[in-house]
């Protein structure tokens, strides 16, 4: 059933119960409280919904924004105890604050930028496209065990506060902000930081799209790599203190990952202790290996784990012909 209470220039409240609803036009809701209530079934929006109150999605219901061709907008608050699905027809910025215990899915291939406070406690699955948590935005609740799953063909990056575990599947990418946003360099505290565990079955991309060097990606949790996973970095190959991208893991590391190094303008030099590229605060059990030879000038660099548990690029002179 569709129940709407009309009040002057718009609806005071809208309640939907049924199996499937599609709203392709614009809707003004001028009520308060849970003025848009999706009790059961699935509601797909492909127009502009202006809600002065709150939208609530019940446990067994779903709300889809966009129909794959058209883009939907939703203002007001959003309590998600069911499932919210993004299937927008174009790149989209979502500024609505989302709470609740429900799950979120992104199924389109466009870019979704989150700018609000997303404190829902359910899981998030990114099936495709790019998802960005912008500066000042949040995703997840501190101490939560919820997971963001980055599937094949999907990319996730943050300049805000992410309090979820991250599972990168084969073909998925967890990226540094400027690996996705070009030469956009930010210094906010949440940039390139995950407050949770990261399992990597795909790619952890630290290298900037503009070939700059010096990204520091931080995992405030454990890191687990699986066979075939990659960590991709830029370095200016030289002596110990030469610029390089860096991965900081405050917890422990497990499993295995390949490390791919792109030399950006380095001529090579003799290292003494080596260029630190990965630091680990807890138990350092992961096995990291170079994905391909790393050579600069007359110097070949190899990857070694030191007694501190951290990983370093160390150089040696290549044999002359």
Residue ranges and their predicted role:
Residues 320-321:
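Outer membrane beta-barrel translocator domains of Type V secretion systems
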Residues 1-15, 23-25, 33-34, 40-47, ...:
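Extracellular beta-solenoid/beta-roll
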């Amino acid at each position: 059933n569709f129940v709407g209470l009309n009040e002057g220039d718009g609806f005071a409240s809208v309640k939907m119960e049924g199996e499937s609803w599609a709203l392709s036009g614009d809707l003004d809701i001028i009520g308060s409280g849970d003025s848009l209530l999706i009790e059961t079934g699935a509601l797909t929006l492909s127009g502009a919904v202006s809600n002065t109150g709150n939208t609530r999605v019940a446990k067994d219901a779903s709300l889809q924004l966009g129909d794959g061709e058209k883009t939907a907008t939703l203002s007001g608050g959003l309590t998600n105890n069911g499932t919210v699905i993004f299937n927008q027809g174009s790149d989209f910025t979502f500024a609505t604050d989302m709470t609740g215990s429900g799950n979120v899915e992104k199924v389109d291939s466009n870019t979704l930028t989150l700018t609000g406070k997303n404190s829902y406690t359910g899981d998030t699955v990114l099936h495709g496209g790019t998802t960005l948590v912008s500066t000042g935005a949040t995703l997840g609740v501190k101490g939560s065990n919820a997971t963001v799953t980055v599937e094949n063909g999907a990319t996730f990056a943050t300049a805000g506060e992410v309090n979820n575990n991250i599972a990168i599947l084969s073909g998925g990418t967890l990226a540094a902000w400027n690996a996705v946003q070009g030469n956009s360099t930010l210094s906010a505290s949440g940039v390139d930081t995950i407050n949770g565990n990261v399992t990597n079955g795909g790619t952890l991309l630290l290298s900037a799209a503009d070939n700059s060097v010096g990204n520091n990606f931080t995992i405030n949790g454990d890191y687990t790599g699986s066979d075939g996973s990659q960590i991709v970095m830029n370095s200016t190959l030289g002596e110990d203190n030469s610029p390089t991208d860096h991965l900081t893991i405050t917890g422990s590391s497990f499993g295995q990952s390949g490390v791919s190094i792109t030399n950006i303008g380095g001529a090579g030099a003799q290292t003494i202790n080596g260029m630190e590229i990965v630091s680990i605060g807890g138990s350092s059990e992961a096995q990291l290996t170079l994905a391909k030879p790393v050579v600069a000038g007359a110097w070949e660099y190899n990857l070694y784990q030191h007694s501190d548990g951290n990983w370093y690029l160390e150089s040696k002179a290549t044999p002359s012909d």
